[in-house]
Amino acid sequence: MSQKVQNLYEGMYVISATLSDDARHKALDRIQTGITGHGGEIKKLHEQGRRRLAYEIDGHREGYYYLVYFTAPSSAISDLWQEYHLNEDLIRFITLRTDEVMEKIEFKTLDEQQ
């Protein structure tokens, strides 16, 4: 039997800021369990904390941001997206294919970018 190809993905998840700490951790566990349940493996998790949203989304003005690097078969991504759409605690998400895991997240100021 041939083994399915595991691609590396970067997922950004915004979880509702109205949840209790316990409920928020359960929502994050649900995301991680979904990934591993579809044959994926979590490589790195960056907790970005509570942040103001750029614009209001379904009545939410703030959310907890999580950046997750994981491997999974490409066939799992559409199944994960379906699960994410049904997760009421998840305000927004995006999943992108990437080439490397960022061990440390740093942002440049506007002056540094010019």
Swiss-Prot record:
One of its GO terms (biological process) is translation. The keyword RNA-binding applies. One of its GO terms (cellular component) is cytoplasm. The keyword RNA-binding applies. Keywords: Ribonucleoprotein, Ribosomal protein, RNA-binding, rRNA-binding. GO terms for molecular function: small ribosomal subunit rRNA binding; structural constituent of ribosome. It holds the Pfam family Ribosomal_S6. It comes from the Bacteria. CDD domains: bS6. HAMAP family: Ribosomal_bS6 (MF_00360). Binds together with bS18 to 16S ribosomal RNA. Belongs to the bacterial ribosomal protein bS6 family. This is Small ribosomal subunit protein bS6. It comes from Protochlamydia amoebophila (strain UWE25).
